[in-house]
Amino acid sequence: IILGIPCAFGLYMINNKITKCFVFICWLIMLMPPQITLLPNYIGLRDMGMLDTRIGVVLTMTFSTFVVVMVYQYLKGIDESYVEAARMETSSIIKVIWYIVMPTIKPAVLALFLFSFTDSYNMLEQPMFFIKDIRKQNLVIFISKVADTGKMFFPAAVIFMIPLIIIYMVVVKSIDNSILGECKGK
């Protein structure tokens, strides 16, 4: 999300045919199954010496075309005059993003955080491919190992879901408050 928002903002500000072509390529990449990128990611992590590390798995999730496309589409709904007025007031594009764009796209960012966290939390193939040490692998793989024993599968699955449920409740409440705040402000 941290890399996707500035990228989407750049695409929003530079509105030409090349930008539209790049957004279309992002749409096409979103249509590909994520397993296609396993081998290039494996080769990259191997060359950097980051196999069998948790940082290597996190590194493969740092950029998402889903975030870029969704934030770009959300930004298209913002009136450009707000951004242009903010750019006239300050020379820093970071301040424009932080003080003008981020409060406006807060509901979208929160929803994307929820989707990205759930996707990362339920990740199966990447930890299996990139991490061989069982102690470093995530809970999904642990539960699949516990499923072999049978008795502990359902309690482990319930415990596994607790962080997702808590984050879901917090994020949904924040999204509702953001949307209600926007409605009251108008």
Regions found by a protein language model. Give the residues of each.
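A structural signal for multi-pass alpha-helical bundles of membrane permease subunits
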Residues: 1-186
